[in-house]
Curated annotation (Swiss-Prot):
Entry coiled-coil feature ranges: none
Chain's gene name: nadK
Family annotation (SUPFAM superfamilies): NAD kinase/diacylglycerol kinase-like
Protein's UniProt name: NAD kinase
Residues reported in the UniProt entry to bind NAD(+): 73-74, 147-148, 158, 175, 177, 188-193, 247
Length: 292
């Protein structure tokens, strides 16, 4: 039988014994099927396996053509920010809460994985966001995000002032608790909680969602994904932060400004052929069922 994947990496950040057991069972299942399998080095030390092949995340990105992430969406976000720099496909087994990205149910994971490994899958290329903090025309800090980039104050419930430029054109100024700049992937995350719309993941767009703005006229704004966003701040602003996927935090100092744009890198997320995005929304968000 043709092998669509030759080398597979198993990654995750397990916090519960059930997730650790899933790592062990999956490793043995893949080895039995004849695949070359690497387990992320930090996880392997916690598993009861005899001489498994181990690798760092970067090594998995270089060596493997498929990474299986075991955990919740947070695990996949952490992993994908590194693996997106490599030509590797990613699929997730949900051991967390919602599981918008890790869409394989642990109860039927082997059935769905068998479909994928036999070539019955499709690829979604989810774009990322680059964020760069500039000081005197030089990049002082940078990162990437899959879900969203969030501007917020260091202190909770502290209003800030900023201006937003899109493609070097002034768009709006705002007094608010911050601003969420989201990808379509992130539209079911933080921005949804802030009143933003859900964006179908194949749409090439970026979403700007105000956080508790001090005006009723402030509304979410959807722009083209090839737009370049620049954030400027008044000289009195101090202790501002930029958060990427709620996992990486970059401080913004006085006289610094922020650029956000679509990255050249993608998350190569794969799904079984039977995957249905709207079915996922219905089940995860408890939407109404069909009438007929």
């Amino acid at each position: 039988m043709k092998q669509y994947f030759n080398c597979i990496g198993i990654v995750g950040r397990p916090r519960h014994s059930t997730a650790l057991i899933t790592h062990e069972i999956l490793y043995k299942w893949l080895i039995k099927k004849g695949y070359q399998v690497f387990i992320e080095y930090n996880i392997s030390k916690k598993l009861n396996l005899k001489n498994p092949k181990t690798a760092t995340l970067i090594e998995i990105g270089r060596l493997c053509d498929l990474a299986i992430v075991i955990g919740g969406d947070g695990n996949l976000l952490f992993t994908a920010r590194i693996l997106s720099y490599f030509n590797i496909k990613i699929i997730g087994i949900n051991c967390g809460n919602l599981g918008f990205l890790t869409d394989l149910n642990p109860d039927n994971k082997f059935k769905k994985l068998s479909e994928v490994l036999s070539g019955k899958y499709f690829v979604e290329n989810r774009f990322l966001l680059d964020v760069m903090i500039y000081k005197k025309e030089q990049v002082s800090k940078s990162s990437i995000a899959i879900n969203e980039v969030v501007l917020h104050p260091k202190n909770v419930a502290h209003m800030i002032e900023f201006e937003v430029y899109i493609n070097d054109n002034f768009a709006f100024s705002q007094r608010s608790d911050g601003l969420i700049i989201s990808t379509p992937t992130g539209s079911t995350g933080y921005s949804l909680s802030a009143g933003g719309p859900i964006i179908e993941t194949s749409l090439e767009s970026i979403l700007l969602v105000p956080m508790f703005p001090h005006t009723l006229s402030a509304r979410p704004l959807l722009i083209r994904s090839d737009s370049v966003i620049r954030l400027r701040f008044s000289d009195i602003e101090t202790d501002l932060k930029i958060s990427c996927d709620s996992q990486i935090v970059l401080p913004v100092k006085k006289k610094e400004y922020v650029f956000i744009r679509r990255s050249n890198y993608y998350l190569n997320l794969i799904h079984p052929k039977s995957y249905n995005y709207f079915e996922t929304l219905t089940s995860k968000l408890n939407w109404s069922k069909k009438f007929f």
